[in-house]
Amino acid sequence: MKIDEITVEGYKSIKSLKNFKLNNINILIGANGVGKSNFISIFKMLNFMFSKNLQQHTQDKGPDSFLYYGRKTTEKIYLEFKFGNNGYSVTLALTQNNKLIVERENIKYYSSTEWINTLGTNMLESRLSQATKYAYSKKIAQYSLGGIKSWKLYHFHDTSDTSKIKGVCAENDNLILKPDASNISAYLKRLYSEHREYYDYIVYNISQIAPFFGGFIIRDSEIYN
């Protein structure tokens, strides 16, 4: 499900970004260090929260690295996502024992009024993946959960010699495209064989940037790149 708006406060280099509207395609343009990667990393953090690995994610680099200019300037992070008539918000707070915890977590529904259901407060880990257990309305929780689970983060910019996108993969590793694109060759071959219209659409869009591109080389092999 498409995200309509996002609000970010106190996260890394982002002091305050309120009700930022997102379209079907959004391009972030700016010099190195202005916060493009930090904006994308919000969704990486959300993935860790969903899998109950917030502490692992934040302790590796230290909670201060996630706060805007560290704890001397910022004590809390606030994230809010609006999608359709539904929403999700979370406040992360720094504790005295140097942990970033979930101070408050809500799922929301927007109609004539804003319906807010708090999933929990002052928790080491998020309850997002268990929203149907803690929400008053199971139906709204299921819908919100389904929307959030559909968001996938793909990070393809690594073009080094050790990049996984340049590695080999098994031909049958093609059900879903992995976030690091390590199985992109197998996935493209499946599109070519079973969903040609999507494959052709990819080739067409690449050719708009590189007119000389005519398609990928498709060959049969159990392991290939």
Where are these regions (language model features)?
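Conserved lysine of the Walker
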Residues: 36
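Short, intrinsically disordered, charge-balanced linker/junction segments flanking boundaries
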Residues: 221-225
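Hydrophobic anchor at the beta1->P-loop junction of P-loop NTPases
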Residues: 28
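N-terminal pre-Walker A segment at the start of P-loop NTPase domains
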Residues: 1-15
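P-loop (Walker A) phosphate-binding loop of NTP-binding proteins
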Residues: 31
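Electropositive, glycine-dotted interaction segments
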Residues: 86-218
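Conserved P-loop NTP-binding catalytic core
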Residues: 40-99
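Phosphate-binding P-loop
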Residues: 17-23
